[in-house]
Amino acid sequence: EMCIRDSVPRDGLPSGSSGGIIQVKNLEFDEIFSSSDTTGGYVDVTNFTMSITPTRNDSKILVSVDVAGGMNDNVGFNFRYRVQRTVGGTVTTIGIPPSGSYAMTGGYNLYNENNAVPYIFGMSRTFFDSPATTSSVNYKVQVSHSHAGSGAVVYVNRRGSSSNWRGISTMTLMEVCS
């Protein structure tokens, strides 16, 4: 937990005030993760999760996520990720559009023509969340691909053809007075 000097009193601003950072949490996720889920559904990225406990019920949480994602040598597919918030057992997907059958926080299309070398890409998203609680709020990253049953494998922090090509993924949570 960190308090930004000269930004906000440690207990936050008076109710109705706006602006100011109360606390910042950061996770540098450097583990290699892979999923060969055959359904194309979302899976949790093990250990790519972080919690913050807001000091105020009306605070917003600035969520910034950067995912280093890769693919295997098999086929082109859509790599996608999403962020989920859990408060007291209630899970909510956040940072997604209000509609769409493939709603996601971020993603990209990877087309691996003729088994060309698959790459690793960084995808960043930043958005405000309003959990409206002073209880612990957990944020986690999930990944998926678009080709169920295809043998597609998604990776976090490496590309598909070699574990020597590595990346690092990050999550930053900032409690901001609204």
Region roles according to the model:
Residues 6-17:
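Short, surface-exposed terminal/edge motifs of secreted or surface/virion proteins that either
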Residues 21-32, 49:
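Short amphipathic
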Residues 28, 34-37, 42, 54-136, ...:
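Terminal beta-strand-rich extracellular "head" domains
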